[in-house]
Design a protein with these regions (language model features):
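Short, Lys/Arg-enriched N-terminal segments with co-localized hydrophobic residues
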Residues: 14-35
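Alpha/beta enzyme core
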Residues: 41, 45, 52-53, 57-257
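Often metal-dependent polyanion-binding catalytic scaffolds in large enzymes
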Residues: 38
Length: 258
């Protein structure tokens, strides 16, 4: 069989996916939180000269010394995405001088809402070497699935909190408040996700530019479109921009990477 990197997307259609059995080599999930009394985040630890368990694991995987990796983490050139609540994670580093990492997007939608199927996708992705799982669920009760991911999946887990905001509160977009959006970010952090996509860049000034300057295309980002629509409906500033410091405090508390 050819190496996956030598194949085109269509070549995978005939592949049969082998799901991991009970003898999987993935590390077992441990109960409880990782100890972080001396530092808040992996970056903070690196800046303090503290060698974390995650740093040691990543250095070994990347065939680097701790002394080579630590300054890269301290300077923000490498991120070790490892939420302190995701205790079964098999840590990976992302960034400068490291191996390329594979991310797999999945999640339920209105048209496909079977969480068991999504978990099968997760197992298949991990068994084939995926380093990260991005949960893009946009329908139904997402909490049990997200918590199952962080309880059982050793890969990094990412989410897009804005996708979850409307379905979490089950209210019209225009009725949500800035606090509602920020609270969902906290919920995802508490649930153990390792990284999040936040649409902080669009501002009231940006909206005026969009209205007065013709674009070749409409906004193509789903999350960006939701933020844009909410701002137009309410006349308010982007909550992720206006309350950015509060968002950073939340992410720092749980060690979540943006």
């Amino acid at each position: 069989m050819l190496s996956p990197v030598a194949l085109a997307a269509g070549d995978f259609l005939t592949w049969r996916i082998r799901l991991p059995d009970s003898g999987s080599s993935s590390p077992p999930c441990e109960k409880g939180e990782k100890r972080m009394e001396q530092y808040t985040t992996q970056m903070d630890a690196a800046r303090r000269g503290i060698v974390t368990k995650e740093l040691e694991i990543v250095a070994k995987k990347e065939r680097m010394t701790v002394e080579e990796l630590m300054p890269l983490v301290a300077e923000g050139k490498v991120a070790i995405c490892a939420n302190k609540h995701h205790t079964c994670i098999d840590p990976e580093g992302v960034g400068s001088m490291l191996r390329t990492k594979i991310n797999v997007n999945l999640g339920v939608s209105r048209d496909c809402k079977d969480y068991d199927v999504e978990m099968e996708k997760v197992m298949a992705a991990v068994s084939m070497g995926a380093h990260a799982i991005m949960d893009l669920s946009s329908h139904g009760n997402t909490i049990p699935f997200r918590r199952k991911l962080t309880a059982e999946c050793p890969a990094m887990i990412g989410t897009v909190p804005i996708y979850d905001s409307v379905i979490h509160y089950q209210r019209d977009l225009a009725t949500l408040t800035a606090k509602d959006f920020i609270d969902v970010v906290r919920l995802h952090a508490e649930d153990g996700v390792d990284f999040v996509t936040l649409h902080c860049g669009i501002t009231r000034k940006t909206i005026e530019q969009i209205r007065t300057h013709k674009r070749k295309m409409n906004i193509v980002s789903r999350g960006g479109s939701l933020v844009f629509a909410w701002m137009c409906m309410t006349g308010n500033e982007n909550p992720f921009y206006e309350h950015y410091d509060e968002v950073l405090d939340i992410l720092r508390e749980y060690d979540v990477t943006i």
